[in-house]
Amino acid sequence: MKPLRYTASALALGLALMANAQAVTTIPFWHSMEGELGKEVDSLAQRFNAENPDYKIVPTYKGNYEQNLSAGIAAFRTGNAPAILQVYEVGTATMMASKAIKPVYDVFKEAGIQFDESQFVPTVSGYYSDSKTGHLLSQPFNSSTPVLYYNKDAFKKAGLDPKQPPKTWQDLADYAAKLKASGMKCGYASGWQGWIQLENFSAWNGLPFASKNNGFDGTDAVLEFNKPEQVKHIAMLEEMNKKGDFSYVGRKDESTEKFYNGDCAMTTASSGSLANIREYAKFNYGVGMMPYDADAKDAPQNAIIGGASLWVMQGKDKETYTGVAKFLDFLAKPENAAEWHQKTGYLPITKAAYDLTREQGFYEKNPGADIATRQMLNKPPLPFTKGLRLGNMPQIRVIVDEELESVWTGKKTPQQALDTAVERGNQLLRRFEKSTKS
């Protein structure tokens, strides 16, 4: 009988352990962070899980921003959505209209966890807030602005001052020509051409991208990025391309790899590219502000954010939402938000994270690491430079890419391409406007 008692005790212990394991609430988190950024996401999740054994955040890379958004919406329609979905900033209007989301302020309220929305940097939180209530719909996570990365060693070889990156686009054109002449394969390349060369070019130089304050004041907005200032800028890049000083290398972040492998001497790319540049560049590099148009009045103005936020999906149980609230609260804590900012190059999303980073001496030890934040806070945003809230914006970006590519290949003039992009984009805006009223 004694062995039987031991067997029964072991069985009871095993069942207890199984019950305990089953009590852990699994929280799927779909994201678009790859490479070093993906490793940092995994690290955050592992730390949260260790501190909160009743919950398990499971991060899963689901492809680039467009692919992740499509996968998330498709999964929601079949009842298989993740609890947390990372969506890039131009997907905000789409998510708001999708009826697939649970506003983060509701998630925190129902979980009984205090949520101070004022802790977030206003120019970031304003992008993801309900225009009517002012409450956050999603939680800022990896916000960025475009910055200029430049190869200091290549600058020296070309006779340029490695401490003085170009301040204006006119300067950049001159620098690119000298760098190409010195033997570089590529003087300048740009990542995310629509976001940088039109969306941020417009804001940085105090120009609207669309009417209705870039869509914040209504879904009946129309695109306005085919004005003389934007046309002149694209024409300058076209001329650089003809001379071989500007190289078009892709629609997304391809220019970052071209930079850190030494092919391109300069690139404008996301501040969030810093993690990979820091990891892979084998030369001295610097970080500068986005160039501005020397002819623009009162430029530079302020940069608008890129990157993404975290959306909570509908259809989950109470315990899952409590775990989600705890995880989002964990991410916003000063020490965690500051570490994410410092390791990745993304903006400090809270004031406390910025203050902590400064107090730790990070900016003194890493010159240029505060460039993205300084650009965002350069001047108080104008009504039409605080961001974009345009329906079908992901598809509009594809149109912009197609039309800009027609310029780089010589098929269209800058004016023709931007006029066509505006016309095609407005058709998508009207389609979105109609869908929100039906």
Curated annotation (Swiss-Prot):
Q: What family does this belong to?
A: Belongs to the bacterial solute-binding protein 1 family.
Instruction: Please tell me where this protein is predominantly located.
Output: periplasm
Which InterPro entries does the UniProt entry name for this protein?
Bact_solute-bd_prot1 (IPR050490), SBP (IPR006059), SBP_1_CS (IPR006061)
As for what it does, the entry says: Part of the ABC transporter complex UgpBAEC involved in sn-glycerol-3-phosphate (G3P) import. Binds G3P.
Query: GO cellular-component terms in the record?
Result: outer membrane-bounded periplasmic space
GO term, biological process aspect, one? transmembrane transport
- This protein's UniProt keywords: Periplasm, Signal, Transport
Q: Which residues form the signal peptide?
A: 1-23
What's the encoding gene here? Answer: ugpB
Q: Which domain of life is it from?
A: Bacteria
User: Which locations, inside or outside the cell, does it occupy?
Assistant: Periplasm
Query: Where, in this chain's numbering, is sn-glycerol 3-phosphate bound?
Result: Y65, E89, S144, S270, G307, Y346, R397
Q: What is this protein called?
A: sn-glycerol-3-phosphate-binding periplasmic protein UgpB
UniProt xrefs under PANTHER family: ARABINOSE-BINDING PROTEIN-RELATED (PTHR43649), SN-GLYCEROL-3-PHOSPHATE-BINDING PERIPLASMIC PROTEIN UGPB (PTHR43649:SF31)
Q: Self-association or partners: how does it assemble?
A: The complex is composed of two ATP-binding proteins (UgpC), two transmembrane proteins (UgpA and UgpE) and a solute-binding protein (UgpB).
